[in-house]
Amino acid sequence: MINFKNHKLIFLFSIIFFSCSEEKSEFEPSDSQIPPNILLIIADDFGKDYTNGYIEGNLKPQIPAIDNLRLKGLQFNNFWSYPTCSPTRASLITGKHAFKTNVLQPGDILSTNEKTLHSYIKEIPSNNYSNAVIGKWHLSGNNNMINPQTYGLDYFAGIIGGGVQDYYNWRLNTNGAISNNREYITKTLTDMAIDWIQNQNNPWFLWMSYNAPHTPFHTPPVQMHNQGSLPDYNDNLDPKPYYIAAIEAMDFQIGRLIQSIDASKINNTLIIFIGDNGTPGMVSQSPYGRQKSKGTLFQGGINNPMFMSGFGVNRLGIDNNLINTCDIFSTILEIAGSDQYDSMDGKSFLELLEIDYEHRKFQYSEMQNGTQNSKTISNGNYKLIRKPNTDLFFDLKNDPYENNNLGVLNLNSSEKSALNELLSEIENIK
């Protein structure tokens, strides 16, 4: 296992500067005594059907920066988030399942009594991490009353609510100070991240939370995308080119961000990229479609892209382990040197960066629609979705896109055994 806590191993690398080049080179070993920088990049409403490397979907954007992370790192095929943004973010920052934080749907408020990832990292002796969240927050409700710094952040710049009405006309919150901004938001957020990183003398943890490619559909600056000359969007137009353009513009800015990191620091930086939930129904592609996309517990709503690349990622290629959102909390804590990384619902998968092993036997997600709660659990082969008035049971190995509900009656012995196992485990979680 990699010993990030003591930083006494020398790591071999297969990435150089995370540039958009496909040429493969090796990093020089970094100073093993310096705690690694951690860059967590979150894309908003970005599913597998629009991500290269996954078989879902036919339309794929040109995203060389994200591709570079994937090709020179580890691709996770079975990462589960929540169906919407706020629960995913609450689980990432607390290491808890959604029902334990009461953040079950967009706009729910994370209690200021919750201890966050940033607060845990601050308590690590001698590491002296600086931390920041730049971009979308959406854990203080929809009325923007609670400043993100209340949750243990050193620095916040971005939008507190769930999104913007206009990518070119929006309100920027910088540590509580509000200003109007008329620059393309994806670029502005990246500029602020670049400035923040360049001003750090200590190891740093940056939570880089883009609001792209979330609606509204729009036309990004032409130099940032490959969709040609798009007219202003209206409801009579196909939204897919606009959605792809926003993804490509985000990737353009991710490339800028990564390339801006000084060579002496990039050697010592771990990058994690995730989508916070599935693709919106308006643009969701086969095999998902509108009914099995964002806002649902089907795979198209919760089984999302995740890549890790850089410092300590010595195992390259594809990983098929079951990963929960809260596991990222635990993994970041262990990387940063905390001994409390498995104290919540999350389970660190740090060893997967070195070797393949069974990380966990079950994965879990849930959602609230109004006053009704639904939840789902899987063992990788079978999946159970428990709705208020019905249960859905699927054989994911033979039916990965959940087209054939097996029900709970007339099951064969293997199916009955799997169903009973999932029913038992979901009760243990609750």
Locate each region found by the language model.
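Short, conserved catalytic or interaction motifs in soluble domains
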Residues: 22
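Short, aromatic- and cysteine-enriched interfacial helices/patches
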Residues: 2-4, 26-27
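Sec-dependent signal peptide recognition
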Residues: 4-12
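Carbohydrate-binding surface patches
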Residues: 396
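Formylglycine-dependent sulfatase
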Residues: 25-387, 391, 400-424, 428
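C-terminal motif of bacterial Sec signal peptides marking the signal peptidase cleavage site
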Residues: 18-19
